[in-house]
């Protein structure tokens, strides 16, 4: 089924899309950048760089991270980080709703079937 992909280009080299939002949601749910990275099958370094890029994209940080210690470190989303997720998901829902008729038309016309096999062209 065709799916809408929403990406906001905030500035050159700074974008916000489903990958970064997914990472923020995992950090929110798991309380750790490391755990979020593992859950998303990416390196800790990659996750850290994505979060650093997000923090540089806005006037306020999206994550508040603490370094390890006796009980290890952790990360929590800032109030602004939670707002970023909320606004992105709201925009995504609004966009999907507004183009749903067109997406259904593409779905009906698509030659890609449920198993992902492309029908032969004549």
What are the language-model segments listed below?
Residues 84-106:
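Alpha-helical linker/hinge and terminal dimerization helices associated
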Residues 65-91:
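Basic, amphipathic "hinge/linker" alpha-helix immediately C-terminal to the N-terminal HTH DNA-binding motif
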Residues 41-43:
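Central "turn" residue of the DNA-binding helix-turn-helix
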Residues 27-37:
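Short helix-boundary/capping micro-motifs
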Residues 1-12:
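Short, Lys/Arg-enriched N-terminal segment that forms or immediately precedes the first helix
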Residues 56-61:
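Residue cluster at the C-terminal edge of the helix-turn-helix DNA-binding motif
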Residues 50:
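Residues within the DNA-recognition helix of helix-turn-helix
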Residues 101-122:
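C-terminal regulatory/oligomerization modules of transcriptional regulators
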């Amino acid at each position: 089924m065709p799916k809408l992909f929403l990406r906001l280009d905030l500035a050159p080299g700074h974008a916000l899309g489903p990958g970064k939002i997914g990472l923020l949601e995992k950090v929110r749910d798991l309380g750790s950048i490391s755990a979020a990275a593992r859950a998303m099958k990416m390196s800790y370094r990659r996750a850290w760089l994505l979060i650093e890029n997000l923090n540089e994209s806005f006037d306020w940080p999206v994550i508040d991270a603490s370094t390890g210690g006796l009980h290890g470190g952790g990360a929590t989303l800032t109030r602004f980080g939670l707002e970023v997720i909320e606004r992105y998901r709201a925009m995504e829902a609004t966009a999907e709703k507004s183009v749903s008729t067109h997406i259904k038309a593409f779905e009906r016309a698509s030659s890609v079937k449920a198993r992902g096999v492309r029908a032969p062209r004549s």
